[in-house]
Amino acid sequence: MLSGMEKQPAMLLVLVTLCAFACKRSVAQSAFATFYGGKDGSGTMGGACGYGNLYNAGYGLYNAALSSALFNDGAMCGACYTITCDTSQTKWCKPGGNSITITATNLCPPNWALPSNSGGWCNPPRQHFDMSQPAWENIAVYQAGIVPVNYKRVPCQRSGGIRFAISGHDYFELVTVTNVGGSGVVAQMSIKGSNTGWMAMSRNWGANWQSNAYLAGQSLSFIVQLDDGRKVTAWNVAPSNWFFGATYSTSWVQF
């Protein structure tokens, strides 16, 4: 057993690790923002995270496509950011310095045919948010087209439990994880059938995680771990008669 003196360095390491993540999230950084998807935001549905209908996924219209410098090959799907129009840099901000919190749901790809400062807004290494129009119009005037912003990563507030949409076929389960609170970013996942042990899953693309086990006829449990190290276990969230194409959720498993 560790003595009190021996425990202190270990506890300090944990606190420093947690602080490093929290402090990084709380520091505002500069970027630019545009908008897409139409006035009703319908053009933002789907996207490179694989969420499909963003209402069903728990994310709604306040979303954005991230430049590749922020998107990180899909690893940042589900992250939440507070975005504020930078009134010191432009006259096109809405009065009052309004901020909006959005969820990362898509990739804004590079456009190498255009210069980075004239149309190629999402070209690396630019940090850029292509926001849904409804989200954009909370902070900036429509006619502006593009504005400088300040952003910082913030915790995600979600209603209800985490959702697991299962697609695939025998020996291949592709699970899309949505409505994730806390940091919002899934870093690791594991799956367990009622007749198996825990098996690590791998990210296939976006928010889609895969397993190559035959799990038909078994209830399914999942461990979801976020990029801040927090994790939850959703025991038997999918019953033994689960089927491909269905979404399963819990009201009690959330960050």
From Swiss-Prot:
<keyword id="KW-1015">Disulfide bond</keyword>
<dbReference type="InterPro" id="IPR036908">
    <property type="entry name" value="RlpA-like_sf"/>
</dbReference>
<feature type="signal peptide">
    <location>
        <begin position="1"/>
        <end position="28"/>
    </location>
</feature>
<dbReference type="GO" id="GO:0016020">
    <property type="term" value="C:membrane"/>
</dbReference>
<feature type="disulfide bond">
    <location>
        <begin position="85"/>
        <end position="93"/>
    </location>
</feature>
<dbReference type="InterPro" id="IPR007112">
    <property type="entry name" value="Expansin/allergen_DPBB_dom"/>
</dbReference>
<feature type="domain" description="Expansin-like EG45">
    <location>
        <begin position="46"/>
        <end position="161"/>
    </location>
</feature>
<keyword id="KW-0472">Membrane</keyword>
<keyword id="KW-0134">Cell wall</keyword>
<dbReference type="InterPro" id="IPR036749">
    <property type="entry name" value="Expansin_CBD_sf"/>
</dbReference>
<dbReference type="InterPro" id="IPR009009">
    <property type="entry name" value="RlpA-like_DPBB"/>
</dbReference>
<dbReference type="InterPro" id="IPR007118">
    <property type="entry name" value="Expan_Lol_pI"/>
</dbReference>
<keyword id="KW-0964">Secreted</keyword>
<comment type="similarity">
    <text>Belongs to the expansin family. Expansin A subfamily.</text>
</comment>
<dbReference type="GO" id="GO:0005576">
    <property type="term" value="C:extracellular region"/>
</dbReference>
<feature type="domain" description="Expansin-like CBD">
    <location>
        <begin position="171"/>
        <end position="250"/>
    </location>
</feature>
<protein>
    <recommendedName>
        <fullName>Expansin-A3</fullName>
    </recommendedName>
</protein>
<keyword id="KW-0732">Signal</keyword>
<dbReference type="Pfam" id="PF03330">
    <property type="entry name" value="DPBB_1"/>
</dbReference>
<dbReference type="InterPro" id="IPR007117">
    <property type="entry name" value="Expansin_CBD"/>
</dbReference>
<feature type="disulfide bond">
    <location>
        <begin position="49"/>
        <end position="77"/>
    </location>
</feature>
<feature type="disulfide bond">
    <location>
        <begin position="80"/>
        <end position="156"/>
    </location>
</feature>
<comment type="function">
    <text>May cause loosening and extension of plant cell walls by disrupting non-covalent bonding between cellulose microfibrils and matrix glucans. No enzymatic activity has been found. May be required for rapid internodal elongation in deepwater rice during submergence.</text>
</comment>
<dbReference type="Pfam" id="PF01357">
    <property type="entry name" value="Expansin_C"/>
</dbReference>
<dbReference type="InterPro" id="IPR002963">
    <property type="entry name" value="Expansin"/>
</dbReference>
<dbReference type="GO" id="GO:0009828">
    <property type="term" value="P:plant-type cell wall loosening"/>
</dbReference>
<keyword id="KW-0961">Cell wall biogenesis/degradation</keyword>
